[in-house]
């Protein structure tokens, strides 16, 4: 497809989405010159604004002013994306294959894709909570539309190491230690031994092993570990912080290593404590230090009802009032946010630790619009809407009198994804300032997490950082989305390497290195997080324990995990690696020259794959696309464990979908596969996905009526229209198909 045609098609996908469907039946109320869905207006006007002391008329008028003032600039930024993409397409068509490095870089600078690096300077962020600034630890990402998931994640600040080990393949199912319906004491002993080995590694005793300890108690204001008739102390005397219970017989002992807390829980009457000579029933680890409540890639929020549900959950998390009725077996209980944890400090005073994860909220990017609010019959940009509403809903989370407040520093943390270069980051900075003024919040109350997941941001990362130097809270690599943009940006250059080979392509490691180097050089350590991406294989925790520690050794002080259990296991890595020391070493070594490698386009050196290899790539990606899309479109599930073609559960969201659809669109564009082969694979894989979902009573089969399956048609569009979709994003097609399905089935 010629470059200008791709650009026009991209605009058409977006503009069609902005104009409200004539069949729209949403009940609306006019406020602030906007037509707002009544369900959203009522929630904000009746539930939120009175609680936060904001006048409703002033709020809605100011809301409308921000939308009208900032919409033209938002449109300009999207038009600039299309303009640059058209120029890139033309360049690749004239220079197919891997570009000449010097000429390519010069071209990118000429068209403004690459900008000059800003002068040496560091970020100036203030009032950052310690969980972000000075604590290294795991980060969860959870869909905000699911209250149970949100509560589980918020409460995942503390997690049972014993449960995490026993319930996963972190302890191999072998040698009599297999998992089963009943408790396996052989497995239990392996868990206990793992825990003792861990304590010896990260909190060693001076002259003894934790495995030999017969009793723990407190003497002379210190932890006493009794072995035979001797008393042994921790090598690090400062590691002991406090206890609960009595000096002689504590019920818990609080320790600290690398800034993270460890709680030894003691109960000789407990089934596990009975088997342990010290009465130790569990080792509780500080786990998910921070959590991102997600309105973006892990949710399917396509209309006012969906958005209002998410906003309500976010509001109640900030008030501390979110609850959920949970059924387990024949009993039902109410899940709520955990209280803070209270100990007796080693000085005898009360010591209180935060009981919940520190929460970020991820807004959507600059591309999408949403029918929850209209202006002159057109949907407003969802990113502007998110910025205003997630902020006003977060105000209770900074209220000093709130016992379950989120931030003790008075900051609201917003992750902004899918930004292309410093101009777009500057737009976010301006938007946040407008929101602060609307809500009478001090300047830079809103902190921003900048996702480094688009190519134009990666190659201009320093400039992006400095555009938000007064409000930056993190930078984070998102390899999955970043790969999707890598493919789409250079779609016309030629056929790309296979999806799995992207992991070892030169640009990938250079991209990861550059993120850390830029963060360190711009002064993030001690002020903001430098993060890395998700471990997607939810059931392979043993493999995660072995491999994910590598992200810390590369300089990340946080990395994403798919579950509270994953957070607890990943937390052990931060005890074994002092990340801030690693960052000091990287700073001393000097910044690596990464730009040339980042610009290395992953065009395949040759395309002589065998028919079997092509079929494997087709089937793997088609199965992945269908397995995710069918739940997104027909069940409104934006993030879930999706079995791959080998029945291995993978945590899938829109980022993984973007890669799978873009690689096939690329191969189709360059004749590696044909449209007929794509359709044939989709139809075969639909049968596989149907079988994988056979146990779900709410599931609708895609086969054999493929033309009637909305999900199948969505998957087909994602591939066949993949070159047209702006930046390879899947949202325009997914949103349209989800709304179609809801309309067909009368779902609100």
UniProtKB/Swiss-Prot annotation:
InterPro entries: Malate_synth_C_sf, Malate_synth_sf, Malate_synthase_TIM, Malate_synthG, MS_C, MS_N, MS_N_TIM-barrel_dom, MSG_insertion
Source organism: Corynebacterium efficiens (strain DSM 44549 / YS-314 / AJ 12310 / JCM 11189 / NBRC 100395)
Binding positions (Mg(2+)): 453, 481
Function per UniProt: Involved in the glycolate utilization. Catalyzes the condensation and subsequent hydrolysis of acetyl-coenzyme A (acetyl-CoA) and glyoxylate to form malate and CoA.
Pathway recorded for this protein: Carbohydrate metabolism; glyoxylate cycle; (S)-malate from isocitrate: step 2/2
Binding site for acetyl-CoA: 141, 148-149, 298, 335, 562
A GO cellular component annotation in the UniProt record: cytosol
Annotated EC: 2.3.3.9
Intracellular or extracellular location(s): Cytoplasm
Gene behind this protein: glcB
Name of the featured protein: Malate synthase G
Family indicated by similarity: Belongs to the malate synthase family. GlcB subfamily.
Molecular function as annotated in GO: magnesium ion binding; malate synthase activity
């Amino acid at each position: 497809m010629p470059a200008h045609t791709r650009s026009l098609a991209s605009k058409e996908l977006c503009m069609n989405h902005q104009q409200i469907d004539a069949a729209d039946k949403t009940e609306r109320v006019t406020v602030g010159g906007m037509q707002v869905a009544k369900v959203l207006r009522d929630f904000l006007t009746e539930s939120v604004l009175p609680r936060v002391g904001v006048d409703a008329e002033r709020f809605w008028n100011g809301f409308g002013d921000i939308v009208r003032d900032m919409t033209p600039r938002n449109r300009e930024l999207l038009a600039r994306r299309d303009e640059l993409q058209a120029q890139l397409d033309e360049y690749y068509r004239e220079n197919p294959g891997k570009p000449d490095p010097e000429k390519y870089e010069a071209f990118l600078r000429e068209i403004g894709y690459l900008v000059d690096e800003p002068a040496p300077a560091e970020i100036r962020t203030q009032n950052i909570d310690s969980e972000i600034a000075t604590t290294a630890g795991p980060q969860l990402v959870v869909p905000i539309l699911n209250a149970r998931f949100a509560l589980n994640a918020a409460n995942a600040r503390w997690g049972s190491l014993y449960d995490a080990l026993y319930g996963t393949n972190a302890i191999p199912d072998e040698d009599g230690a297999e998992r089963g319906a009943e408790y396996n004491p052989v497995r239990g002993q392996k868990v206990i031994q793992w825990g003792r080995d861990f304590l010896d590694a990260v909190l060693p005793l001076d002259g003894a092993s934790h495995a030999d300890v017969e009793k723990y108690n407190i003497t002379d204001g210190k932890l006493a570990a009794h072995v035979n008739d001797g008393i042994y102390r921790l090598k690090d005397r400062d590691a002991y912080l406090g206890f609960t219970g009595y000096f002689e017989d504590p019920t818990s002992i609080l320790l600290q290593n690398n800034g993270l807390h460890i709680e030894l829980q003691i109960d000789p009457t407990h089934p596990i404590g009975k088997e342990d000579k010290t009465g130790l029933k569990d080792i509780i680890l500080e786990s998910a230090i921070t959590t991102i409540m997600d309105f973006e890639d892990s949710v399917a929020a396509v209309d006012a009802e969906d958005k209002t549900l998410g906003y309500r959950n976010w509001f109640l998390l900030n008030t501390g009032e979110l609850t959920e009725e949970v059924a387990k077996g024949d009993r039902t209980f109410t899940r709520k946010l955990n209280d803070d944890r209270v100990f007796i400090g080693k000085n005898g005073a009360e010591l209180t630790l935060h009981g919940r994860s520190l929460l970020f909220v991820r807004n959507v990017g600059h591309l999408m619009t949403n029918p929850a609010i209209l202006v002159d019959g057109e949907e407003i940009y969802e990113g502007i809407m998110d910025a205003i509403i997630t902020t006003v809903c977060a105000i209770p989370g900074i209220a000093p009198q709130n016992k379950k407040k989120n931030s003790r520093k008075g900051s609201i943390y917003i992750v902004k994804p899918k930004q292309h270069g410093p101009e777009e980051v500057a737009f976010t900075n301006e938007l946040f300032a407008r929101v602060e003024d609307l809500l009478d919040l001090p300047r830079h109350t809103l902190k921003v997490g900048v996702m480094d997941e688009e190519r134009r941001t990666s190659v201009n990362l320093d400039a992006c950082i400095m555009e938000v130097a007064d409000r930056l809270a993190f930078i984070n690599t998102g390899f999955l989305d970043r790969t999707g943009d890598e493919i789409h940006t250079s779609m016309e250059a030629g056929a790309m390497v296979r999806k799995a080979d992207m992991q070892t392509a030169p640009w990938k490691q250079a991209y990861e290195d550059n993120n850390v180097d830029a963060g360190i050089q711009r002064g993030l350590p001690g002020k903001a997080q430098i993060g890395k991406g998700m471990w997607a294989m939810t059931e392979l925790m043993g493999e995660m324990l072995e491999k994910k520690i590598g992200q810390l050794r590369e300089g990340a002080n946080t990395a994403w995990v798919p579950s509270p259990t994953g957070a607890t296991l990943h937390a052990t890595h931060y005890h074994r690696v002092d990340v801030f020391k690693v960052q000091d070493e990287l700073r001393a070594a000097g910044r690596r020259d990464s730009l040339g490698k980042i610009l290395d386009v992953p065009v395949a050196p040759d395309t002589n794959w065998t028919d079997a290899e092509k079929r494997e790539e087709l089937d793997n990606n088609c199965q992945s696309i269908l397995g995710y899309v069918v739940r997104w479109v027909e069940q409104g599930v934006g993030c879930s464990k999706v079995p791959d073609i080998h029945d291995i559960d993978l945590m899938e969201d829109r980022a993984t979908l973007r890669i799978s659809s873009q690689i096939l669109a690329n191969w189709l564009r360059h004749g590696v596969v044909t449209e007929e082969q794509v359709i044939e694979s989709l139809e075969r894989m639909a049968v596989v996905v149907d079988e994988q979902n056979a146990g779900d009573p709410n599931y609708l089969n895609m086969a054999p009526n493929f033309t009637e399956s909305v999900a199948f048609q969505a998957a087909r569009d994602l591939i066949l229209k993949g070159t047209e979709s702006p930046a390879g994003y899947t949202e325009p097609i997914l949103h349209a198909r989800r709304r179609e399905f809801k309309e067909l089935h009368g779902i609100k």
